[in-house]
């Protein structure tokens, strides 16, 4: 009997099972599902409520919930502008390398190269700006562009700014574009024939809008999203730049206390960029009248939708705090301090009370900012810009009695610095007496910026610095030589047994480098104060051994102290006569060192009244002419000491060394002629008679 074909039967059996399963699903859901399906994001919440057995599940959560758009939050769908292909990536990468090397013969060659890159990027500007690898190239191009190129690029970005300012890479391009376009907001569109011919040759139309009109377009695009962009991590720094441009305020990213750039902003500077444009960006500018009204409206729109509680919460928000600083600064400085009286102003909403009472709302807010790493920066801005009457009340009720303990704190200490800058002579005297007991602890923990600023303010206000000098002297070693080494954090001379690895580890310690820098800045500030404060540094310098002086001169940070000591107005001829001779025999060694060469340069003005010392030093340099000419820093020293003049025309060099020959600097005064002397005599006589006239009339 033939065997049954099992294969065909199994297929039929499987098909029957599938049909049965389909019928079962059509009839009703199974109580126990065999296979778990991954829930979608939209239904995950409702499923959890069903499984957990919630007592109440509101209707309409699932049915038709996706059909209603959410209008409260801005759309998060970032448009995709496309990707650069491999050839384009390679071209722009090479262009970036060329700009980094900056080996152009002249500015014209660099301009032609920038033009060629712009032609290659035509139509791909948005792709380049959003590219992780090429956005830096776009920033460099903008920095090297003229106003015509900036206007063309600006016009390409119009219509996309709402998305670009929120992009991780394109936001930095927008920031650079705003900074470089700011000086041209008052320029009118030129329609010269040469420009028309250039446009026809490049076959690219010139934008019809001026830069001022383009900035207004940017404001229109961002309208209605200010409240969201205020705390958007990529848009925040671009919004700050836009506010400064509208206000005509300088946009200086190199400033240490600038709140314009983002915290992680890279310095993509190019060597030999046009100095006038950089200077224009760092100066206050004239802006069109429409900018002021627009700025006021934008600032109002940013905070009008926020209640006072949320506005104060921005003070400690890492992203919103810098924008709030800019808003407070512009409100108090640009629109006048009288705006602080407006109850709807930002400063009045933050600090509603003038008296700063014990339980006042303003006191609670300010005390909360004092020790907050983020909020203290806003408090610094408020103290710098707030009206005098409000500042006096704040200082009297919150800071004055606690200024010593506040100076000890690493965060509140910066608020103390801003406070010291606004105190009058009497209040500064009292503040100094409160801070002096804390000086030893501050120096022990390398918090040297507080005594540094205190010395500067005492010099400005004319406060006696003798108590401060005594506190500094007691805080350091009694030995003058050790005192300077402690202040500058100088390490003992490295022996031959020290390993190279240990030296590298010491050199890479950022904390030690920062402490050395602050010690050097404190010593330089002390040298500007006449009397016992500068005497502490001068006595320490005279107590140094020759080897120690060489170490000081070759140290990049410590050598600044030597330069300041040689050229400061407090430096006496007696000190310079003793100190300058210590460098004899080591001038060539120092002149060939990158840091020591600056000390040799400082010896030229330091020996202005010590001609015999200067002549001896010049002869020492002349003996090693070949060594100096073979070195870059050596050639600079040779030039600054006018050694060619010393070598060929010794008499002219002597006149210049004594300060008699100042034609080069334009300092020589033309001898007065007889008519000039007669005019001066007549003017003095007329002034004397005019001063006597009121007295005679009164008698």
Curated annotation (Swiss-Prot):
Q: Where is the composition biased (Basic residues)?
A: 1-10
Tell me where it resides.
Nucleus, Nucleolus
Which residue stretches belong to region Disordered?
1-66, 491-510
Q: Ranges of Polar residues compositional bias?
A: 41-50
Its lineage opens with: Eukaryota, Fungi, Dikarya, Ascomycota, Pezizomycotina
State what this protein does: RNA-binding nucleolar protein required for pre-rRNA processing. Involved in production of 18S rRNA and assembly of small ribosomal subunit.
Write down the species: Aspergillus fumigatus (strain ATCC MYA-4609 / CBS 101355 / FGSC A1100 / Af293)
List the InterPro entries hit by this protein, alphabetically: ARM-like, ARM-type_fold, NOP9, Pumilio_RNA-bd_rpt
Q: Where are the Pumilio repeats?
A: 120-155, 156-191, 361-396, 397-433, 540-580, 582-619
UniProt protein name: Nucleolar protein 9
Sequence ranges of Basic and acidic residues compositional bias? 11-27
Name the gene for this chain: nop9
User: Which GO terms fall under biological process for this protein?
Assistant: endonucleolytic cleavage in 5'-ETS of tricistronic rRNA transcript (SSU-rRNA, 5.8S rRNA, LSU-rRNA); endonucleolytic cleavage in ITS1 to separate SSU-rRNA from 5.8S rRNA and LSU-rRNA from tricistronic rRNA transcript (SSU-rRNA, 5.8S rRNA, LSU-rRNA); endonucleolytic cleavage to generate mature 5'-end of SSU-rRNA from (SSU-rRNA, 5.8S rRNA, LSU-rRNA); ribosomal small subunit export from nucleus
Q: Which family does it belong to?
A: Belongs to the NOP9 family.
Q: One matching Pfam family, short form?
A: PUF_NOP9
């Amino acid at each position: 009997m033939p065997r049954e074909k099992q294969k065909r039967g199994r297929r039929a059996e499987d098909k029957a099972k599938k049909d049965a399963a389909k019928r079962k699903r059509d009839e009703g859901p199974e109580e126990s599902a065999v296979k778990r399906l991954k829930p979608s994001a939209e239904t995950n919440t409702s499923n959890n409520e069903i499984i957990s057995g919630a007592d109440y599940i509101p209707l309409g959560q699932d049915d038709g919930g996706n059909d209603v758009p959410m209008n409260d939050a801005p759309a998060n769908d970032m448009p995709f502008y496309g990707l650069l292909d491999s050839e384009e990536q390679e071209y722009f990468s090479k262009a970036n390398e060329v700009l980094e090397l900056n080996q152009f013969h002249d500015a014209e060659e660099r301009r032609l190269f920038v033009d060629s890159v712009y032609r290659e990027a035509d139509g791909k500007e948005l792709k380049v700006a959003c590219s992780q690898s090429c956005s830096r190239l776009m920033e460099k191009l903008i920095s090297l562009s003229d106003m015509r190129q900036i206007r063309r690029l600006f016009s390409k970005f119009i219509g996309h700014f709402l998305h670009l300012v929120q992009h991780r890479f394109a936001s930095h391009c927008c920031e650079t574009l705003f900074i470089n376009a700011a000086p041209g907001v008052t320029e009118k569109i030129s329609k010269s024939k040469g420009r028309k011919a250039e446009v026809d040759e490049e076959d690219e139309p010139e934008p019809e809008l001026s830069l001022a009109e383009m900035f207004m377009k940017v404001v229109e695009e961002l309208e209605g999203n200010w409240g969201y962009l205020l705390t958007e991590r990529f848009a925040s720094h671009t919004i700050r730049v836009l506010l400064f441009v509208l206000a005509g305020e300088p946009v200086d990213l190199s400033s240490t206390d600038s709140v314009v750039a983002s915290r992680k902003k890279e310095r993509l500077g190019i060597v030999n960029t046009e100095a006038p444009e950089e200077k224009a960006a760092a100066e206050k500018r004239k802006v069109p009248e429409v900018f002021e009204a627009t700025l006021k409206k934008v600032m109002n729109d940013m905070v009008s939708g926020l209640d006072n509680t949320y506005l104060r919460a921005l003070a400690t928000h890492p992203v919103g705090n810098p924008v709030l600083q800019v808003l407070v600064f512009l409100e108090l400085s640009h629109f006048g301090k009288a705006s602080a009286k407006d109850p709807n102003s930002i400063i009045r909403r933050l600090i509603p009370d003038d008296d700063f009472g014990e339980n006042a709302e303003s006191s609670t807010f300010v005390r909360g900012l004092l020790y907050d790493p983020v909020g203290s920066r806003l408090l610094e801005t408020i103290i710098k810009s707030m009206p005098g009457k409000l500042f006096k009340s704040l200082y009297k009720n919150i800071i004055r009695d606690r200024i010593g303990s506040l100076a000890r704190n690493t965060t509140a200490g910066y608020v103390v610095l801003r406070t010291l800058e606004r105190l009058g002579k009497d209040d500064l005297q009292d503040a100094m007496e409160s801070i002096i007991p804390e000086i030893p602890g501050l120096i022990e923990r390398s918090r040297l910026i507080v005594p540094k600023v205190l010395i500067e303010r005492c010099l400005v206000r004319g406060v006696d610095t003798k108590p401060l000098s005594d506190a500094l002297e007691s805080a350091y070693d009694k030995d003058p030589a050790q005192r300077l080494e402690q202040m500058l954090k100088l390490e003992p001379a490295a022996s031959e047994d020290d390993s190279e690895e240990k030296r590298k580890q010491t050199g890479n310690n950022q904390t030690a480098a920062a402490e050395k820098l602050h010690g050097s800045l404190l010593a330089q500030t002390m040298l500007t104060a006449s009397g016992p404060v500068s005497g502490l540094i001068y006595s320490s310098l005279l107590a140094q051994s020759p080897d120690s002086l060489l170490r000081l001169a070759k140290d990049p940070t410590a050598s600044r102290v030597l330069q300041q000591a040689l050229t400061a107005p407090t430096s006496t001829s007696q000190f310079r006569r003793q100190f300058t001779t210590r460098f004899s025999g080591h001038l060539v060694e120092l002149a060939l060192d990158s840091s020591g060469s600056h000390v040799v340069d400082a010896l030229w003005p330091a020996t202005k009244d010590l001609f015999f010392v200067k002549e001896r030093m010049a002869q020492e340099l002349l003996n090693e002419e070949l060594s100096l000419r073979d070195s870059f820093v050596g050639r600079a020293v040779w030039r600054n000491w006018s050694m060619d003049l010393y070598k060929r025309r010794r008499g002219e060099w002597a006149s210049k060394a004594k300060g008699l020959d100042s034609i080069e600097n334009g300092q020589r005064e033309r001898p007065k002629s007889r008519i000039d002397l007669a005019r001066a005599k007549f003017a003095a006589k007329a002034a004397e008679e005019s001063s006597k006239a009121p007295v005679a009339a009164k008698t």
